[in-house]
Amino acid sequence: MAAPPRPAPSPPAPRRLDTSDVLQQIMAITDQSLDEAQARKHALNCHRMKPALFSVLCEIKEKTVVSIRGIQDEDPPDAQLLRLDNMLLAEGVCRPEKRGRGGAVARAGTATPGGCPNDNSIEHSDYRAKLSQIRQIYHSELEKYEQACREFTTHVTNLLQEQSRMRPVSPKEIERMVGAIHGKFSAIQMQLKQSTCEAVMTLRSRLLDARRKRRNFSKQATEVLNEYFYSHLNNPYPSEEAKEELARKGGLTISQVSNWFGNKRIRYKKNMGKFQEEATIYTGKTAVDTTEVGVPGNHASCLSTPSSGSSGPFPLPSAGDAFLTLRTLASLQPPPGGGCLQSQAQGSWQGATPQPATASPAGDPGSINSSTSN
């Protein structure tokens, strides 16, 4: 008896894609060419199950996404960024915004940065030149920053709009993403403005610091002030008229002259020995000039001194103050070895005990060693 025929084998079941295969296909997307990606995207958009897929994605999003209804639409402005903007505007680096500020904007455009609108000194000219360089660098970098921010924002917006065709992306979410991008770029903007402010402050401290200006007197101004100081060493307190004259000769202000004399007196008291050589130079120069002008016929190389037995003061011509140095230098007897000049008489302003007058009675206005106060 013949055996029954065997049934035909059933066709193999279609192979189901597991998770690893799906992930492999997803990872392969990055290796696709642009034409392949466009073809796959077009096929997906035309697929009959695409609306169902989109509906499922919307349901999943409603269950998992965090509601954004309670989030503020706009964050408050950064206080530190506002302070930096105000500082850059005050220094003339930022351009004032064209809003309803009227005269304030006009004044900001006409005033010279740094609070020196009418000062044409070398320091301020150099300051304005370097400030202009800082301003150019700042605006160049700010323009690059703004361009990069615009390009990146446009790219992300286009990407989200394209993805919204496949997954639910609302316009509100796109706005939130743009705001997050601007927040990231704001840190770069703040760093740029902070660096610019530090550069301006460093420039101001180097070129507009009043203490530095006092140290940078010209050689002519220093010569004028030193000559007056050592020629009036027994009373180095110039009057207001003398200060005006010294300021005019040295190209300084009266305040600078007053400060210089105050500092000079302090330094002289602290280290008198150090200034003896300098005093000899200036007093010798002044004595020669005064002798040539006010004492015609006097050819002596050394100054004569009154004898200890003299009963009257050293004679003063009508020039008065012009011969004050001669009297000061002649107030002490020269050493036995012979010397033209003695050390300067010590007045009360120098902190030493005044020497009694030997050439005239106490209280005589012509006394050489009488104590003098300001």
Curated annotation (Swiss-Prot):
It is found in: Nucleus. Residues 14-209 form the PBC domain. The keyword DNA-binding applies. Disulfide bonds: none annotated. Residues 210-272 bind DNA. Residues 21-100 are annotated as: PBC-A. Residues 341-358 have a biased composition (Polar residues). Pfam families: Homeobox_KN (PF05920), PBC (PF03792). GO terms for cellular component: chromatin; nucleus; XY body. Residues 333-374 are annotated as: Disordered. The keyword S-adenosyl-L-methionine does not apply. It comes from the Eukaryota. Keywords: Activator, DNA-binding, Homeobox, Nucleus, Transcription, Transcription regulation. Residues 103-209 are annotated as: PBC-B. One of its GO terms (biological process) is eye development. GO terms for molecular function: DNA-binding transcription factor activity, RNA polymerase II-specific; sequence-specific DNA binding. PANTHER family: HOMEOBOX PROTEIN TRANSCRIPTION FACTORS. This is Pre-B-cell leukemia transcription factor 4.
